[in-house]
């Protein structure tokens, strides 16, 4: 079921505004995956994990979200795009070429996106992740820890 869900991109995204409450303006948008097949997006990701398709779902979701954002005419002046990503996606050997493709498609500039690293996944090589994050930072892509401190 999850393979078909991914292959047909049977999901869409909401872009939740993130406000600077002190200054009263939108600083960016958090990308939220939604679907009619999964009432809760966590169920889709859990299914992808179970079927070893997490990278496929994560990368397809990121790509579709960026295409949607870009085709809607949003630019840097509307704010930064905050995109949730699993550590295993960042560590996947296909991820660097995925980023290159996105950059070539001009779906983002390196300052347009912040990868929010999910804490829901805990079984990964932290040293390897640090190296990947350094590489992202070298090309100007920012990152943050998603839901830091929530257990």
Residue positions per predicted region:
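Structural preference for beta-strand elements that scaffold enzyme active sites
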Residues: 12, 28-30, 78-82, 112-116, ...
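Short acidic-capped amphipathic helix/loop micro-motif used as an active-site/signal-coupling element
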Residues: 36-39, 62, 66, 147
């Amino acid at each position: 079921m999850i393979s078909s869900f991914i292959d047909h991109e049977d999901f869409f995204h909401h872009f939740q505004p993130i406000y600077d409450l002190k200054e009263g303006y939108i600083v960016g948008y958090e990308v939220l995956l939604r679907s009619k097949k999964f009432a809760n997006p966590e169920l889709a990701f859990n299914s992808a994990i179970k079927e070893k398709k997490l990278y496929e779902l994560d990368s397809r979701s990121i790509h579709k979200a960026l295409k949607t954002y870009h085709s809607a005419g949003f630019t840097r002046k509307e704010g930064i795009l905050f995109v949730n990503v699993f550590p295993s996606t960042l560590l996947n050997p296909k991820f660097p070429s995925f980023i290159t493709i996105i950059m070539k498609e001009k779906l983002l500039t390196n300052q347009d996106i912040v990868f929010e690293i999910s804490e829901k996944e805990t079984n990964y090589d932290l040293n390897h992740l640090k190296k990947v994050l350094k590489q992202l930072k070298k090309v100007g892509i920012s990152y943050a820890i998603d839901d830091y401190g929530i257990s």
